[in-house]
Swiss-Prot record:
This is RNA polymerase II assembly factor RTP1. The gene is RTP1. One of its GO terms (biological process) is protein secretion. Belongs to the Tango6 family. Residues 630-652 are annotated as: Disordered. Signal peptide: none annotated. InterPro entries: ARM-type_fold, Rtp1_C1, Rtp1_C2, TANGO6/Rtp1. It comes from Saccharomyces cerevisiae (strain ATCC 204508 / S288c) (Baker's yeast). The keyword Disulfide bond does not apply. The lineage of its organism: Eukaryota, Fungi, Dikarya, Ascomycota, Saccharomycotina. Its main location: cytoplasm.
Amino acid sequence: MNEDKEQKINIHDILNTRPKLTKKTALDVFFEDLDDNVITPINEYVLDSGSSSSSSIYQALKCSNNNEFVAVLLQKFQNLHIHVLEQQRRLIESKSDLLPISLHDMKYVDELINLLIIHGIDANLSPTMKIPFDSKRINTFKKGQKSAEYETPRWHTINNDTLSQVITVFYNVLTSERSSDYLREIISKGSAYANILLGLIVLHLQLPNRYSSQMITNLEDTQETYTLFGVYTLLVETIQDEKVREPILSKLTTLTLRRPENGLISLIDFVLGVRDAEDIDIEKFNRIYQILMSKPKTMTNLQYLTELFKQIYDGLTFVNRPILVTCLNGLILKFYLRNKRIVNDFLFKKVRSIIFNSPLTDHTAKELNDVINVLISLSKNSSSDLLNDLVTSCPDEDGTTPGQFFLYVWIYALFLKKNQKLDPLEINKLSISDNKSTDSIHFPEQSSSKYYEVVLSLLKSLIVITENFQYLNVLSLNLLNFEHEKWKYLIDLDTQLPYISVKNTDMAELFFEKGSKNSQISEFLQDMDLSIELFMEFLVLLNDEEQSKTLFLDILKRWVHHTKKSEKRSSDNHSGMPSVTDNALILMDLKLLECMNNRFKTKIVNKPKDVLIVIDQLIDVVQEKDETIQEVEADSDDEVEEGEETEELDPNENSSYKIILQLLSTVLSESSSSILLQNSYILKSISRKLQSFNTNASEIDALLASIDNILINGHTTERNDNIEIEMDEERLDKAITSLHDPLVPIKSYGLTELRHLAEKKSPVISLEKVLQIHLDYLKNMDPFIYLNVIKGLTTLCELEPETILPLLAEFYANKKKKNRLDDVLKVGEVFINYIQRQNELFQGKLAYLIIDTCLSIVRPNDSKPLDNRWRMSSMSILGMCLQINARGVSDRIRDMLDCVFGILQLEQPQNHLKDKDDSFLMRRSAVHLIHDLLYSTGFDLLPFEYNYDKLKTLLSYVRDQDEDYMVCEQIDKLLTVLDSL
């Protein structure tokens, strides 16, 4: 009850409280004045004057000319700036989150700025020097509704002083050193910036001087690089005056290098439309390559390549931006194909200088992390030759050999495994460290993996893609190599990030003898176990049966030979003690053999021929070793009893001999008789050698019995005729395994292997199966994968067009609606690539198959309308057909023009739609297709019903009616082409 009463009292008080009027700010008063004395008079004058040619908007403010009118507007703008800054100061002092200018008042700001752009800048530029009104994108402008307030009187003459005054006022606002200026943000983010920059450039051209040149630079510095690309592109596309276009084009072409911190990345983002979430188009990649493969006229080759590759290197560190990395890899490959030395001198040298630390110097955590990221990005390059040059073409002057590149990466992984106890990424997230240097370091998106595992994955990618498996043996020889001679890795305790430090030789000698001998031995054995554990982890990650078997046999041969040499030296040495180094190597190899045998036993003996050959060879080595030892022992001790001597020389007491016999036993028991019989000549050789030993060991007797049983009960036939097929089957197995690998570069490698099998027409896999696998991986979201698939599908089209093209056309038509639109569009890219490669050979029934498929998609379907992106893709393919060989597909030109006329006449803007209207896409593509036809053959192939007069009439009509400024702009250019033909 009390609550109800209290509620009633509160409501009563509220209802009877008089409104509390907020005190007007100076800014509120300003906007009232602006509305009363500028905006309203102009609007009223526009309504009253109508379309009278004798009237002028300047009369609305009682001004006689443009200069007086602009002076009034400038005074208002300067007052606005003062009031906005004061309002910002008050809001900051009161810690308010309010905006300095309300949304209601923003319309006055926009109107004032627009008036200054039109009457202050545009009116004082010649028609060929200014941005066309249609391209200004002023929000209040609609097609056919240009307001009189934006019209300049015909009697007005250009006044450079007025232009200079306007530019100076805007320039001072944009380049002010204030940390916060709301009005500056409005101008820099709107369409005004491009007009201000253009006006300043024109003033500089009219009166060139160092001061105005510096002003242009200062004005550029106020804008982010990405936006500048848009501004300069707009100016280049719209400005007709060649004298003005030339410096603008120069600014655009050099912008990438003049912004070393983000010029290249911004260019890629801008052209690919990454920030606008546009579909990735291969043609856009080619456009970037075309831009960057040509140096600006103002730079030497050395300057250009030096500056460009610095940014390429920095861009490759962004491992979590796959589109950027894919584009950069494509650019690097373009330079590599032009001249290998360019990539080697300007990119690879920097990578090697840090990996090998040559010249000798310290490297920060960021430098070390960056070079690993660069390698991760480069491992995704589509060229195995390029990667092979990186890892094997090492300079001789620093004393390195090809295999050492892999070794140095391995040592780094080994160091991380041993010393990096905490994840630096987690430390950075938790802000445990006060060191903010980690903010600029890019970590791979493998949060579930420890960093040493990332490095192991990199090592795997480099070895597999370059097929340098022979260097696995080099790694196995250096498992105990934790450090470098003159420099070392260290861990920053705060950030857990590794860095490189040059060793202090004096300090190293001072602290060399640390700990007791027993502790040193213990640490040595722990390091050995750690390195073997990591190496086994790497072999499991490698997941290659053949290479694991080859490595096992190499280590086995090495171990037997080392054991033989060690025992021989022990026999020659009166002390009978082998060297420490020999013991360490023998022990390491023995442990590694045991681990590999336990982990890969089945895989090692899966294909027994190589194993049997090695066993056959090693029996000779062991036999030779025993005979040598026997001679030495006989000479050194004649008094040894015969029974004792026999016991010393028993082969079964020899560890290497034991392992060989165990391996032979495993092969005989795990392999089928039919497979073993294919290697009967090796089995016979092994049997003879085992029988030559003077021993009664039951193990040898059992092995001899097994071999005899196989040889007696089977047929000794060889299958030399199927060796090539067996090799192809191995390659296929390897490719399928690679496709299921989690690492992106390895997946791509698997696709490449499949294409190699298809190219050689191997019977182990059909072309249709290769195609289906490629289409499955076309759905992969990683651009590195699906761009590789697009490239591969193009190759398959060239290989067997009669088989592949009909299947791809069916996929692209998507009549059963089973395929995602994104995947369909990617197949469209395949068609474009194929048409370009065919060039003038693109004709005949397969060409018509592609064209007819595209026409069926382009034609409007009222019952089931198709996505305009799909239809535009088909229009692009049709346009490419006309560009490449219009005469070869002339029978379909009438059908193409049917679609074009239908689109331009019937597919008008649909503003009533709830969804975004994208009909302009089709109208743009229709105009493009006409351009492609005229550019290719002129009027020669125009059908009678679509002759010159009808074409010009249609284009002129669309130009007058269409609301899309790009459509209008393209038609203007096309009409110019029509008149010139």
